[in-house]
Amino acid sequence: MSRRNTAKKTKRTEKSDPIYQSRLVNMVLNRIIKHGKKSLAYRILYRAMKQIQQKTEKNPLLVLRQAIKEVTPRLIVKSRRKSGSTYQVPFEIKPNQGKILAIRWLLEASRKRLGPNMESKFSSELIDATKGKGKAIRKKEETHKMAEANRAFADYL
């Protein structure tokens, strides 16, 4: 059976959202979704962006990008077993994976935050992240500290 004329797979691209035309906003949106309720996720995200606009008087898309950039980790630690012992081995991660982790940490931190609704908690967490504060920033620093402490095991890949 010849493989010469097989169909080429096209690379899947993420769509951009209708208002901001940003793939990053769409990535955040898809991580907000719970139980398939995309319209609720849209409402939460767009209201949070509106609150950011009112609080900071800056472009909310720039604030979102800055917050994700501040929270994005460069290193993570993974458990590896070697001769009966488990080591926390630091790994460098790809930029896209770091971005995904940053979005996840921002959402986790905003869900744990005290506040009346998800929109205000998420907008506050994003604003804090741009200022270098907040639980998501603390999570990144904690991860980097753990990677630095276990740097001796970096060759146990």
UniProtKB/Swiss-Prot annotation:
GO terms for biological process: translation. Keywords: Chloroplast, Plastid, Ribonucleoprotein, Ribosomal protein, RNA-binding, rRNA-binding. PANTHER family: RIBOSOMAL PROTEIN S7 (PTHR11205). HAMAP family: Ribosomal_uS7_B. Belongs to the universal ribosomal protein uS7 family. It is found in: Plastid, Chloroplast. InterPro entries: Ribosomal_uS7 (IPR000235), Ribosomal_uS7_bac/org-type (IPR005717), Ribosomal_uS7_CS (IPR020606), Ribosomal_uS7_dom (IPR023798), Ribosomal_uS7_dom_sf (IPR036823). One of its GO terms (molecular function) is rRNA binding. The lineage of its organism: Eukaryota, Viridiplantae, Streptophyta, Embryophyta, Tracheophyta. Part of the 30S ribosomal subunit. GO terms for cellular component: chloroplast; small ribosomal subunit. This is Small ribosomal subunit protein uS7cz/uS7cy. Signal peptide: none annotated. One of the primary rRNA binding proteins, it binds directly to 16S rRNA where it nucleates assembly of the head domain of the 30S subunit.
